[in-house]
């Protein structure tokens, strides 16, 4: 499999450091609010990569952190009159609700920054001992210029970074580019004891510590949104590699931005959607499918029209699968179209896998999936049970890689006995050629929310949605 490595700006063949095992670290949310659809993109994209690795037989150690102490969290907690820890616990649980509904698999571990403070202090002390960090009035800063390769991820030199730097008002720093490893205690903020006085860790050191603690000093893949390349991931590399002398991550993967109606998503513009708002109105898998119909590195434009289109497309997959289940019950033992459908499915599956192998090209892969649905719909009514079962299993197999077709609608609600009895009465009326009575029962079923479809394999009942 080839993956685009931000570090080298090329697609590279992926080989894990340890045979049969992939170690991934994905930057998780700051848990001060409900996750928005911009947060959802890396969740869905890198969950899909994980699923594909597992499909290929790898064991995946998947670590995704929670940033549970940070300026936004402190401000909101103070505003609500609760502790940062209470705020974090509330929104971590809300995160799990949203992620579960999006079929995002649970991480191997979700470490919380506040539970790893001792290890952060130890890493900061190590950087001080090696001359890469210094203390100023209880703050600890990283000496950016001492790390010769600073800028290698964002592909900028120190002068370019200086020109675009937001200068910290703390004039005691040796250099405006130096960044905080530890922040001295301020009024109204949570704090922990350290050799430099009470305070809290900087954001960047949190991820370095959690990644190395649970995955080792060099990991296979570090991933996150494009907005994290600089300064967050650049700073992670600097402090981690300065401390260990080893490469921090072999592959750096970044997903593109999500725009709303072709404008950058922002609360101030009023074009801001939480995941919860979308999945309460639309099928959660529609949001997942929408995200995967674009290449993960490209910008993605979100609109309600597009999510509605994704929901219609998702319905086509579910309908195809449900139809296969129905046809299998009454299928013939053989058919002249068996070979045609099998060949089409095998060819499209191969193309799907090729697309996934090429830098996780889910945009192409979903295209082949819908081609497969069309082929199945074309031939399914005249295929054997064996071929239909093969089609159903393959469709399910590929959808499971994408994380869809997992909230199986047909199983959500059993058809009431009253409806089944009416359908049987209608079947008896049709056998007796009493078509007026059959039509009357059909209309009654429709008024009760069900339609009946007469097929060569029997009567199919569908709930009107």
Swiss-Prot record:
Zn(2+) binds at residues 27, 207, 232, 236. It holds the Pfam family tRNA-synt_1e. ATP binds at residue 267. The keyword Secreted does not apply. Its cofactor is Zn(2+). InterPro entries: Cys-tRNA-ligase, Cys-tRNA-synt_Ia_DALR, Cys-tRNA/MSH_ligase, CysS_C, Rossmann-like_a/b/a_fold, tRNA-synt_1_cat_dom, tRNAsynth_Ia_anticodon-bd. It comes from the Bacteria. CDD domains: CysRS_core. Disulfide bonds: none annotated. Keywords: Aminoacyl-tRNA synthetase, ATP-binding, Cytoplasm, Ligase, Metal-binding, Nucleotide-binding, Protein biosynthesis, Zinc. A motif ('KMSKS' region) lies at residues 264-268. The keyword Hydrolase does not apply. It catalyses: tRNA(Cys) + L-cysteine + ATP = L-cysteinyl-tRNA(Cys) + AMP + diphosphate. GO terms for cellular component: cytosol. HAMAP family: Cys_tRNA_synth (MF_00041). Belongs to the class-I aminoacyl-tRNA synthetase family. Monomer. This is Cysteine--tRNA ligase. The gene is cysS.
């Amino acid at each position: 499999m080839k993956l685009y490595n931000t570090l080298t700006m090329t697609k590279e063949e992926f080989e894990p450091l340890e045979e049969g095992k992939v170690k991934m670290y994905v930057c998780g949310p700051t848990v001060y609010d409900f996750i928005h659809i911009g947060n959802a993109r890396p969740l869905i994209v890198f969950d899909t990569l994980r699923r594909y690795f597992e499909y290929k037989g790898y064991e995946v150690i998947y670590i995704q952190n929670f940033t549970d102490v940070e300026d936004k969290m402190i401000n909101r907690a103070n505003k609500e009159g609760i502790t940062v820890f209470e705020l974090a616990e509330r929104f971590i649980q809300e995160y799990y609700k949203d992620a579960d509904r999006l079929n995002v698999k649970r991480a191997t571990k979700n470490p919380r920054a506040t539970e790893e403070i001792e290890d952060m202090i130890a890493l900061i002390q190590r950087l001080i001992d090696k001359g890469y960090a210094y203390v100023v009035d209880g703050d600890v800063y990283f000496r950016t210029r001492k790390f010769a390769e600073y800028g290698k991820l964002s592909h900028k030199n120190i002068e370019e970074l200086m020109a675009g730097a937001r200068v910290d008002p703390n004039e005691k720093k040796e250099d405006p580019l130096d960044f905080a490893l530890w922040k001295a205690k301020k009024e109204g903020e949570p704090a922990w004891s350290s050799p430099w006085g009470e305070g809290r860790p900087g954001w960047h050191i949190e991820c370095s510590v959690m990644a190395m603690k649970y995955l080792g000093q060099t990991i296979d893949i570090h991933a996150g949104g494009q907005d994290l390349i600089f300064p967050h991931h650049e700073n992670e590399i600097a402090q981690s590699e300065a401390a260990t002398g080893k490469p921090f991550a072999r592959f750096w993967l970044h997903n593109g931005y999500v725009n709303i109606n072709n404008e950058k998503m922002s609360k101030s513009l009023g074009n801001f959607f939480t995941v919860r708002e979308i999945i309460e109105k639309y099928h959660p898998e529609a949001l997942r499918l929408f995200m995967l119909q674009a290449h993960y590195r490209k910008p993605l434009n979100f609109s309600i029209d597009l999510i509605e289109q994704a929901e219609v497309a998702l319905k086509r997959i579910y309908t195809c699968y449900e139809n296969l289940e129905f046809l299998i019950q009454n299928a013939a033992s053989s058919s002249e179209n068996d070979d045609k459908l099998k060949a089409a499915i095998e060819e499209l599956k191969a193309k799907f896998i090729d697309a996934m192998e090429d830098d996780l090209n889910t945009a192409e892969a979903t295209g082949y999936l819908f081609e497969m649905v069309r082929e199945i719909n074309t031939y399914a009514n005249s295929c054997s049970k064996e071929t239909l079962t093969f089609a159903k299993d393959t469709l399910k197999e590929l959808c499971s890689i994408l994380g869809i077709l997992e909230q199986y609608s047909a199983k959500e609600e059993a058809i009431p006995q009253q409806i089944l009895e009416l359908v049987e009465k209608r079947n008896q009326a049709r056998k007796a050629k009493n078509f007026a009575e059959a039509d009357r029962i059909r209309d009654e079923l429709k008024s009760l929310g069900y339609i009946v479809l007469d097929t060569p394999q029997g009567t199919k009942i569908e709930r009107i949605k």
